[in-house]
Amino acid sequence: MKFEPKTLDFDLSPYTGLTRESWLEAGRYLLEGIFQNIDDFQKPVVMPRKETEITYPHLKDSQEAQAVQRTAEVFEGLTRSFFIAAPMIGNLPDLTVCGYPMAEYYKNQVLRVCTRGDALYVGTYEDQQEITGHTDPYRTFQQTVETCALVICLWVSKKQIWDTYTQAEKDVIAGFLESYAHASTVPQNWRLFNMLDMAFLHMEGYPIQKDIMRDHAQAILAYYAGDGWYRDGHSFDYYK
């Protein structure tokens, strides 16, 4: 079923008619599409797969590679859906979708993926290196990307989720984030992921390695090509 906004105001929004309420309706529509596939509050956001050749986990890869990919699958499902849920929660703190209170669901899932020993624990950077046998000391992992998504969402829904954790729970999440924030990253726009991790930790009173932050910052400035465009290897990215 396609999305059809119920609220339109062409005086306020002459081209599309879409208003703030329209976007909240769109967010609910997208979340319902996700959560109709989640049959238990404790289960992660892992969508049904149509293929196994292109998207990970790649079933033909080694067991070690699949182990890393499966945790990335859980983490990416959480954080990318959180991109939709976080602003929705910020605007509608009591939002419930498919019977699940969104703030409670994401609060629970975020803590679980960061907690060692939990069935959903996705592992620190050091854990990923251990799984892959330390074959490359500078290896990067998809989880670095997702930590950036996580801190953005925690900031957007700060009052509803982050501020409701106990100090001990915050410390668990911060320790998890710190492992990726200061670890190896791809020497292009991935540097921004590490920077945002460190920025969140710093704003929340956790120590960061400022020399690493400065190094990432000077590199990002060197990538800038003007008018919002940044070099990304042989390509360009636009950031507004």
Locations of the language-model features?
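Extreme N-terminal leader/anchor segments
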Residues: 1-115
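Aromatic-lined, polymer-binding surfaces characteristic
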Residues: 74-75, 85-88, 99-240
